[in-house]
Amino acid sequence: MTDPVPPRIAIVVSQFNPEVTDGLLKGALDHLAAQGAPVAAPDIIAAPGAYELPLIAQTLARTGRYAGVVCLGCVIKGETAHFEFISLGASLGLMAAGLQTETPVSFGVLTTYTDEQAVARSRDDAENKGREAANACLSTVQTLRRIRENALA
């Protein structure tokens, strides 16, 4: 990261499927710290599940304290249509939160067909999707800063 002042980033993490979301959180925290934007414990917010992520993310973004919000969760397909409703609601809600607040809200919600797929995407390696969501958030923060600075020039 090349910004002189590191951006303050919040992380919202679903408490459902913690064996997966804990790995996503570790990936996001490790990446943000490595990029010079460590996240303090008070800036890590628990959400009951993926469906609650959008409201919490939007509320955090509206405080004006955060340059971006990383959202992490895991929805694994079961035997009913619940998977589709939760996945779509979380996806559209997080996109709307970012658009309405003009604050980067990244989508680090796994939507997998099996437990094995979820575990593979939350391992402590370069393919960790929490890491990717944190990277997307930081990259978007930097892009928006450049756009806003150029608009003022």
Curated annotation (Swiss-Prot):
Highest rank taxon of the organism: Bacteria
Lineage summary: Bacteria, Pseudomonadati, Pseudomonadota, Alphaproteobacteria, Caulobacterales
Official protein name in the record: 6,7-dimethyl-8-ribityllumazine synthase 1
Family annotation (Gene3D superfamilies): Lumazine/riboflavin synthase
PANTHER family, per database record: 6,7-DIMETHYL-8-RIBITYLLUMAZINE SYNTHASE, 6,7-DIMETHYL-8-RIBITYLLUMAZINE SYNTHASE DMRL SYNTHASE LUMAZINE SYNTHASE
Pathway: Cofactor biosynthesis; riboflavin biosynthesis; riboflavin from 2-hydroxy-3-oxobutyl phosphate and 5-amino-6-(D-ribitylamino)uracil: step 1/2
GO cellular component terms attached to this protein's record: cytosol; riboflavin synthase complex
Its EC number(s): 2.5.1.78
UniProt function note: Catalyzes the formation of 6,7-dimethyl-8-ribityllumazine by condensation of 5-amino-6-(D-ribitylamino)uracil with 3,4-dihydroxy-2-butanone 4-phosphate. This is the penultimate step in the biosynthesis of riboflavin.
Sequence positions that bind (2S)-2-hydroxy-3-oxobutyl phosphate: 79-80, 121
Keywords carried by this UniProt record: Riboflavin biosynthesis, Transferase
GO BP term, pick one: riboflavin biosynthetic process
Matches recorded under InterPro entries: LS (IPR034964), LS/RS (IPR002180), LS/RS_sf (IPR036467)
Keyword Transferase recorded: yes
